Regions:
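Conserved C-terminal helix/tail region of periplasmic/extracytoplasmic solute-binding proteins
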Residues: 184, 257, 380-432
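Glycine-centered hinge/linker elements that transmit conformational signals in sensory
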Residues: 201-205, 238-266
Length: 432
């Protein structure tokens, strides 16, 4: 992008309406280890115009701090790239980013909110968005961003009581990855239903190779991977002690009982699961878009492909990704100006392409991966991707769900009992 254009863009972004804040001055979360301020070499962004958006006021100037939790070097470099480009093309706003480990995110946010020491923008995991919005930490930006072309799931994750408290950064979803050679050797087709998945997983299990796995950690990461089973039955995230919820737990148990699903998966992150798959220890797995760049680089000769997650009654996938949120009472106008730039078409495409994400803007996503059949499966599945929550109490609800499937996988509880226990916790949280 030309220097002259970005300067004009920022000036235009400074021309109009005043942002409506939603609460007291506070600031945003931090994620990943070693809080460090990013400075990286500047690279060049696409030499095309940034899209216009609802302008900010004349007061857009000063420093803007962003908190983020990505620990992957490529993610950090991509964010730094657009920040350095933005800073280098105008002199009214200076943006800097600070990394905080994901494990420390909630603690840092809570402490920062109490002490009045928060940033101006936060990039956060989308299921956590509603809980922070309910605390009054995020600014209401309903009238500042047009999200009519965004996928419903990402927008819902930014919305509370009909108001928009953030903008989707980028999205990802889950699909079935499969080893083509292992399925062919077992004489199996790609499974489309639960029954077919159980059959194929059983037939491809032999020696040290398990037929199927997904991350089953007792935390949000595990819940993310488990919930597509529940949604596929037609139940919601809050209906675990239901016909469909129990059926989902029973299906998980059937995979374990068949010896096709490793109990060790309760200790596996999504990255661990991917490593097991590319090492030849899994025939199939559930995982997301962000693994593709690594897989293509590390195992270029491995024959693998992707397909929709096998279904019960209906197709379902889990919506992942992050959102941007502006901190109420921070440097809101300058934060808005930067986010207008960051969410414009060419800047968004740069970020998505370098991070393996799908744009949350459907008009961008539909052309993002033309010619790439693997990524296109993920794009097609976005219409079936469900957001976790969004409720302010979601983190506690997620804990109850992950405890349930963990107990079933380890054999510490049967599906019906685990579902009843989880439901009792969920009902107490949402006030039923």
């Amino acid at each position: 992008m030309k220097k002259r254009f970005l300067a004009t863009f920022v000036s235009a972004v400074m021309l109009a309406t005043v942002l409506t804040g939603c609460g007291a001055a506070t600031q945003a979360p931090a994620q990943e280890t070693a809080a460090k301020e990013e400075t990286a070499e500047t690279t060049e962004v696409a030499d095309t115009q940034t899209e216009e958006a609802v302008p900010a006021s004349d007061d857009a100037s000063g420093d803007v701090t962003i908190w983020y939790y990505w620990e992957t070097a490529g993610h950090q470099e991509a964010l730094d790239h657009i920040i350095q480009e933005f800073n280098g093309q105008q002199d009214k706003i200076k943006v800097q980013a600070k990394y905080v480990p994901f494990a420390d995110f909630k603690k840092q946010l809570s402490v920062g909110a109490s002490a009045g020491e928060l940033p101006d923008i936060v990039i956060l995991d989308n299921p956590d968005h509603a809980s922070y919005a309910a605390m009054g930490i995020f600014a209401d930006i309903t009238d500042r961003f047009d999200v009519s072309n965004y996928y419903p799931g990402p927008v819902n994750s930014c919305t509370l009581d009909g108001k928009l408290y953030g903008v989707p950064f980028g999205s990802n979803d889950l699909v079935l990855f499969y080893n083509e050679d292992m399925l062919a050797e077992a004489g199996c087709e790609v499974p489309k239903t639960w029954d077919e998945l159980l059959d194929v997983a059983t037939k491809t299990t032999k020696g040290n190779v398990y037929g199927f796995a997904h991350c089953a950690l007792q935390n949000e990461e595990g819940t993310f991977n488990f919930l597509p089973w529940v949604w596929s039955t037609g139940q919601t995230s809050y209906e675990i002690n239901s016909e469909g919820g129990i059926k989902a737990l029973e299906f998980e148990k059937s995979l374990v009982d068949a010896g096709a699903f490793p109990k060790e998966a309760i200790n596996w992150t999504q990255g661990d699961t991917m490593n097991q798959f590319i090492s030849g220890n899994l025939a199939m797995m559930i995982n997301g878009t962000w693994q593709i760049p690594t897989m293509r680089q590390e195992v270029p000769d491995l024959k693998w492909n992707v397909a929709p997650i096998p279904q019960d009654k209906q197709q379902a996938s889990g919506l992942g990704g992050e959102n941007y949120a502006v901190i109420a009472g921070g440097n809101e106008e300058a934060a808005i100006a930067f986010l207008k730039y960051a969410t414009s078409k060419d800047t968004c495409l740069y970020m998505m392409d370098h991070m393996g994400y799908i744009s949350s803007d459907s008009t961008i996503a539909k052309d993002q991966f033309k010619g790439d059949a693997v990524y296109q499966v993920f794009v097609d599945e976005m219409q079936y991707a469900n957001a976790r929550g969004p409720l302010p109490e979601w983190p506690d609800i997620s804990d109850a769900i992950s405890l349930a499937f963990n107990k079933v996988i380890t054999g510490d509880s049967d599906p019906a009992s685990a579902a009843a226990e989880a439901q009792a916790t969920i009902d107490s949280i949402i006030g039923k």
